[in-house]
């Protein structure tokens, strides 16, 4: 590690002000930033800690609308009773992230803002048609995730919450790396008033994406059997030491079938 100025923000407005200091970075759970700093892949002049801001914490459910504060930890998302009733699929997703240490420190806002191509939350946000709320505006998930580790966030913009309408049916299934527990392929399926959405993480060569062929099949028949013979093109899949593009394409359909079976269950 090296010399860095640490600031504990007292409010979102305070954090936005502190972010103007040199090359500042937001710190919440630190699950990505701190390892990056240790290996000198990131060298911010200032760290602005937002983990103690109460306005950024907690889960609220009002009717069918779910709102989750950006500093809410994975553990809190996984165990919130209101969320388990409104959208159990998202609570289940959070329970699959990392190990207990990661779940108690990592936050939903940090994961979304980082947009790791194998992270779980981006698939959920895309499938649920969520809105990403910042200190300056609201951004539809469809327009928020721009590619590998890229988002629509601008300098000084802070994710404060995510909000979405509770789906009628939803489920998440992932084939995970046994060491990191990141998704080699993760599929979130959600059925709501606007139809069926299927979002995939861990597989696409440009990050999280919607699997339109699977959505079209499920719109006609929301049953795992509707996906028999339906494939996504391997040409748009990433290939690495963990899985080939062809295998990832195969897993997308397999995980989608499992998710539909769970959701329809």
Question: Residues of each region from the PLM?
Answer:
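C-terminal structural segment of proteins
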Residues: 1-265
């Amino acid at each position: 590690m090296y010399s860095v100025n640490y600031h504990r923000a007292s409010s979102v407005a305070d954090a936005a002000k502190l972010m103007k200091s040199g090359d500042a970075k937001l710190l919440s759970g630190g699950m990505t930033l701190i390892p990056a700093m240790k290996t000198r892949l990131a060298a911010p002049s200032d760290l602005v800690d937002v983990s103690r801001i109460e306005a950024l914490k907690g889960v609220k459910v009002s009717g069918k609308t779910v709102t989750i504060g950006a500093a809410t930890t994975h553990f809190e998302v996984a165990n919130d009773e209101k969320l388990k009733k409104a959208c159990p699929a998202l609570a289940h997703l959070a329970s699959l992230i990392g190990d207990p240490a990661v779940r108690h420190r990592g936050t939903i806002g940090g994961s979304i803002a980082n947009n790791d191509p194998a992270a779980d939350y981006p698939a959920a946000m895309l499938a649920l048609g969520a809105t990403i709320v910042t200190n300056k505006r609201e951004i539809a998930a469809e327009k928020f995730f721009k590619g590998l580790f890229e988002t629509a966030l601008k300098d000084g913009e802070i994710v404060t919450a995510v909000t979405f309408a509770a789906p009628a049916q939803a489920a998440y299934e992932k084939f995970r790396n046994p060491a990191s527990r990141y998704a080699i392929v993760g599929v979130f399926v959600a059925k709501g008033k606007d139809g069926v959405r299927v979002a995939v993480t861990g597989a696409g060569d440009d990050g999280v994406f919607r699997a339109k062929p699977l959505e079209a099949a499920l719109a006609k028949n929301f049953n795992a059997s509707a996906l028999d013979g339906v494939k996504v093109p391997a040409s748009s899949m990433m290939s690495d030491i963990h899985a080939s593009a062809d295998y990832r394409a195969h897993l997308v359909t397999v995980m989608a079938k499992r998710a539909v079976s769970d959701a329809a269950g």
